Amino acid sequence: MKNILFRINELSKKEKVSGLTVDEKQEQQMLRQNYTQTFRGSLDSILLNTKIVDQNGHNVTPAALQDAQIRLKLSK
């Protein structure tokens, strides 16, 4: 993931200085899409393994998140 982000930044800097070729522009779009999908997947994974508890120790995880967690457990 670090190398993807490094290349995205490298292309962005080049775009500002001298512009990108058509191939570089396509590569930049593909890398950004790949990075975004990876980031969203990681965030989903984190959220699906999260439990929210108030100061009194009561589970206050939103119902939609609890439903998604149950569906995930059932699909395994």
UniProtKB/Swiss-Prot annotation:
Kindly give the SUPFAM superfamilies that the UniProt entry links to this protein: YnzC-like
Q: Which GO terms describe its cellular component?
A: cytoplasm
Q: Which UniProt keywords apply?
A: Cytoplasm
Q: List the disulfide bonds.
A: none
Q: What protein family does this chain belong to? A: Belongs to the UPF0291 family.
HAMAP family xrefs: UPF0291
Name of the molecule in the record: UPF0291 protein BCE_1981
Organism per entry: Bacillus cereus (strain ATCC 10987 / NRS 248)
